[in-house]
Amino acid sequence: MLNFSSTRRRAGLVAITAAALLGVSGCQAPVNIEDADVPAWKEKILPAASGAVLEDSGKILNRNPLVKESPNVPGGSYTLTMACDGGGKAYFAVSSSGIKIADAAAACNGSLDVVKIKVPGTGPLSISTSSVDAPLIFAYHVVPAAA
């Protein structure tokens, strides 16, 4: 005769074990920002782009913004492609000749975010990258938009 209580216990143990294994296999280890190889990560995550007028990558280890500038960018339509990893969001404030022209954000989950920007006239183009969710790694490039 079957002992239902031991059969139920065994079935419950199998279900708990299966759920734990599924949960562990679905988890991804968090990125260790301090040890991250940013150039290797950037090569994997951000598609190569010819004709970039501005690009940068690096680590945000605190909440201080990182600013990169290109001195003489012609006016026109551009595409800003961004990625970050480490959790939270990274913010990209785009300015042309000292005037903010766009704000963009990327979710720091290893996916790409793309926005179109319009540069009003020839002059310096800068991007201030920041996050309240530091530490994280980021990469971006600005290329002329396809016609």
Summary of predicted features, one role per range:
Residues 28-70, 145:
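Transition segment at domain starts
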Residues 52-56, 98-105:
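Surface-exposed loop/edge segments in extracytoplasmic proteins
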Residues 61-86:
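Short, surface-exposed binding/anchoring microloops in extracellular/periplasmic proteins
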Residues 2-14:
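Bacterial N-terminal signal peptides that target proteins for export
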Residues 69-71, 109-120, 145:
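Beta-sandwich interaction modules
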Residues 22-26:
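C-terminal motif of bacterial Sec signal peptides marking the signal peptidase cleavage site
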Residues 76-80, 117-139, 147:
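Noncatalytic modules at the cell exterior or secretory-pathway interfaces
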Residues 88-102, 141:
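Short, surface-exposed beta-strand/strand-loop-strand elements in extracellular ectodomains
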